[in-house]
Amino acid sequence: MRILETLCIFAPEILLDMEQVEFELELLEEARDFLKSLTKEVRGKIGRNIRRVQKGERDPELFKKLGSSEIWEFRTLFNKKCYRLFAFWDREANTLVVATHGIVKKTQKTPVREISKAEKLRILYFENKNND
């Protein structure tokens, strides 16, 4: 059910496209709140880009590892604005990508504080998972 709830946040038409994907996506609360704060059009574009990556498209303009950290970013350009959704892999739970939070990017480089925030949320995620 988690997958369907996640897809509904982006755009209902994505539910119609349930082909085999290479990974599942889980949104942490901050990522969900970020997406809900965006317009339907922006959410739809982000969702379509994520779906392309889930189906195996390898394009650093859509999904890119950030330096030497364990953090990746889903990248979307819409109406001259750059949207970023930070994420990491949890390979213990099949193949799962966990999105931590998102930003509307305003600078050339991804802010270090946003990468640090994603890294902290990643650590918390695994601590909580291991304590369950």
Regions found by a protein language model. Name each.
Residues 1-82, 91-97, 104-132:
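Basic, Lys/Arg-enriched alpha-helical interface segments
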